[in-house]
Amino acid sequence: MTTATAIVAGHGLALRRSLHLSKPSCATFSARALPPAAHCCRTVVAAAAPSSRTCRCRSVSSESSTAAAADTADDEEEVTKSDSEEEEMDPLAEVCYLDPEADAEGIREWELDFCSRPILDARGKKVWELVVCDATLSLQFTRFFPNTSINSVTLRDALASVATSLGVPLPDRARFFRSQMQTIISRACNELGVKAVPSRRCVSLLLWLEERYETVYSRHPGFQSGTKPLLTLDNPFPTSLPENLFGDKWAFVQLPFSAVREEVESLERRYAFGAGLDLDLLGFELDENTLIPGVAVESSRAKPLAAWMNGLEICSMEVDTGRANLILSAGVSTRYVYAGYQKSAATTQEAEAWEAAKKACGGLHFLAIQENLNSDGCVGFWLLLDLPPPPV
């Protein structure tokens, strides 16, 4: 059994794992042993207490109280006010909102969904809706449509009206998470000069849809309880990893929540490859010392590997303990066998502990790419989040 230490992202955190590295059937990483580190004791990724995280996805109804809370000390009163306003939200109203303090020119990426809702119109037909926002929810737009006008022309015109109505430029990129809508969305975006990006990294949008289900759709007079989503998310069987995405070695690792925050904040400053999440917007209530589970990958081609990974729209990682594989999910419906390990009672226990730790952290985890697992820096860092499929 080999024992190794991975020091991630310049924080000097030594994390030891004990795994027999092996080639899975769709080989990803070599079976070379990691160098031992005698100065550290072994640390198994342990499950923490369940996270108290609540996703506070900013809504239009809470914007005024959020702004006021910044100028007053009575936060609890403002939150109560926000909650009561949300309860009185008109389920028939459409949203057209831009945060007055937002840099309109700086909103270069949108997240959008164009799909049916569990609502019937006067004809007894499904109502469709366009929902658009940015990652910070500074921009929010919704519009309902009859099912007779669902095409790329309708979507193109609606997206153009978002820009004109709010006085913002069209974005450079628009993310969407439903693979079934790729043709319509791509065509509409292309005609506007916007790059359509299939991606499940639409975290703000997904959380806003959850909120709208509770505050809008379920209160609509045409709401159909128990209706399943028309377009469900794909979850295909994982395939072999492309040759250019192979690494040399990998390790289960952990970082304190405070260090994860630092790494995300430093991404833009260092122009590193990777992607973060707005942890404040998501409302993570974790202790700064809570250990966040992750995967560290060593590669002699770390920079090219990180660059290639940067184009994948990585959204999550999970362990398939039955097949002793690590699965990488990217885009909207892509799943790769990213790594494998020799299956045993010990490795299965460690993999299960890693998954349990992830669940205890509200689904938060990360992927780090390094030139050396014993180095004190990383070339690429992706903060990832497990999210359930949207209710619509």
Curated annotation (Swiss-Prot):
Its subcellular locations are:
Plastid, Chloroplast
The name under which this protein is listed is Protein TAB2 homolog, chloroplastic
What the protein does comes down to: Nuclear genome-encoded factor involved in the biogenesis of photosystem I (PSI). Required for the accumulation of PSI during plant development. Does not seem to be required for the translation of mRNAs of the PSI subunits.
Give UniProt keywords alphabetically.
Answer: Chloroplast, Plastid, Transit peptide
| Pfam families the record matches | Tab2-like_C, Tab2-like_N
Species this protein is from: Oryza sativa subsp. japonica
Indicate, by first and last residue, each region the UniProt record lists as having compositional bias (Acidic residues).
Answer: 72-90
Q: Which domain of life is it from?
A: Eukaryota
**Keyword DNA repair recorded:** no
Q: Where is the transit peptide?
A: 1-45
Molecular function as annotated in GO? RNA binding
Cellular component (GO) terms are:
chloroplast
Name where it mostly resides: plastid
Q: Is Plastid among the key words of this record?
A: yes
Region feature (Disordered):
66-90
